[in-house]
Swiss-Prot record:
PANTHER family: ATP-DEPENDENT 6-PHOSPHOFRUCTOKINASE 1. It comes from Arabidopsis thaliana (Mouse-ear cress). The keyword Ion transport does not apply. One of its GO terms (molecular function) is ATP binding. This is ATP-dependent 6-phosphofructokinase 2. The keyword Glycoprotein does not apply.
């Protein structure tokens, strides 16, 4: 019996008229059989199955790409582009490619950048954009449009979208931004506004679910190598030296994991998904002492969200939230440096010991995207444009198993991509570092 396939339904605008895709007349495209994506073209969420098992239900998403017919008259489009949340390599590339794609592929001429995140919709003047204005933005770090956290006032934002006549809204942001975008999408639907909305997934932590990866992640891993290499040199050049590197990753340890596997200089990698302990048999201190005796140095990589429950904090710190509503994390790197020094002074008061702490957070996220991420940002931007022009709304474009798809925004906003400490990749980390299996030691 054939497996049943469940295709995730995409929201679409019903009040617009079908029209011929202007790509038919674009001098750089020669549409042939297979060029246009059809409603029956889908991407499977999972490509590996147990062939010996009985029929398994399969989940699929609509494939991204240009449609033979579009739902917008390009001359009537007024598009808004906004960047929200923290910086991430590739933000300017996405903006550039949205502008160039709308202009060159579909002939859209009314394209506006919204400054300073969500609050810019109702409190700042939009910036008119065209290919000439953005031609070199992909070479710059940060976001030329500026960004901010917070400022999410739903009614003010949707009022501004309506009053300014925007009928396409392209939002570049991470998990908090997506939760806000879900509310904007619902309010737009409630008001029955014919506005297409999409979110290009941005998070350097790579914690967006369903898609293969978020843009900027590969650049971040590449930049993290420099910090780890520096920590290794510092540790190796000292007597009983420890190089301590804190990498981004509030709730997931993907950057720390991939940077550890890539560098091969790391002796221990600590991530939010894995609990650890310091004292006693099988603890971190015992492991580090053994490593220092064997090699004279060690390199420790820790994701910013690891060990947060171990850091002492007062009542006000427990309740503290940032403007996006996220819990404020204490600096695990500063705490680690302190407890490592206290441990060594207690156990080996007469021996030399050095901890060199490196926090490359702002260096990593503020750089321009590398070549791989630049190409990825282009594909994401163009996928978003094709989807909105086809009349879809409330979706996220992204690769699933290497193929680009459209995923319902609400589904992505509710999903988190965390490191699976039971799979082969985490086992690979432990085989490279030879670090303890803290979980097994605790249970044992």
């Amino acid at each position: 019996m054939a497996a049943e396939t469940s295709i995730r339904k995409l929201p679409s605008l019903s009040g617009l008229r079908h029209r011929r895709n202007p790509l038919e007349d674009n001098p750089y495209f020669h549409p042939s059989n297979g060029f246009y994506i059809t409603p029956s073209d889908v991407i499977l969420a999972q490509v590996a199955y147990d062939h010996s098992a009985h029929s398994q239900s399969r989940v699929a998403y609509h494939r991204a790409g240009p449609r033979r017919e579009i739902m917008y008259e390009p001359s009537a489009v007024k598009a808004a582009i906004v960047t929200c949340g923290g910086l991430c390599p590739g933000m300017n590339t996405v903006i550039r490619e949205l502008v160039v794609g709308l202009w060159e592929l579909y002939g859209v001429r009314e394209i506006y950048g919204i400054p300073a995140g969500y609050r810019g919709f109702y409190s700042m003047k939009a910036v008119k954009l065209d290919p000439k204005a953005v031609h070199d933005w992909h070479k710059k770090g940060g976001t030329v449009l500026a960004t901010s956290r917070g400022g999410f006032h739903l009614q003010k934002i949707v009022d501004a979208i309506h009053l300014n006549g925007y009928n396409q809204v392209y939002i570049i942001g991470g998990d908090g931004t997506m939760r806000g975008a879900v509310e904007i999408f619902k309010e737009i639907s409630l008001r029955k506004l014919e506005v297409g909305i999409t979110v290009i997934p941005k998070t350097v932590d790579n914690d967006v679910g369903i898609i293969d990866r978020s843009f900027g992640f590969q650049t971040a891993v590449e930049m993290a190598q420099e910090a780890i290499s520096a920590a290794h040199v510092e540790a190796e050049s000292a007597v009983n030296g420890i190089g301590l590197v804190k990498l981004m990753g509030r709730s997931t340890g993907h950057i720390a994991l991939h940077a550890t596997l890539s560098s091969r200089d790391v002796d221990c990698c600590l991530i939010p998904e894995m609990d650890f302990y310091l004292e006693g048999k099988g603890g971190l201190f015992e492991f580090l002492e053994k490593r220092l005796k064997e090699r004279g140095h060690a390199v420790l990589v820790v994701a910013e969200g690891a060990g947060q429950e171990m850091i002492p904090r007062n009542e006000s710190q427990k309740q503290e939230r940032d403007e996006s509503g996220n819990a404020v994390f204490l600096d695990v790197g500063v705490w680690f440096k302190s407890v490592l020094k206290a441990w060594w002074e207690r156990e080996h008061p007469d021996e030399l010991f050095t901890v060199k702490y490196i926090d490359p957070t702002y260096m990593i996220r503020a750089v321009p995207a590398n070549a791989t991420d630049n190409l990825y940002c282009t594909l994401l931007a163009h996928s978003a444009i094709h989807g909105v022009m086809a009349g879809y709304t409330g979706f996220v474009p992204g690769p699933i198993n290497g193929n680009y798809a459209y995923i319902p925004l609400e589904e992505v906003a509710q999903t988190k991509n965390q490191v699976n400490t039971r799979d082969h990749k985490w086992a690979w980390v432990r085989s490279v570092t030879n670090q303890p299996d803290f979980e097994t030691n605790v249970k044992g």
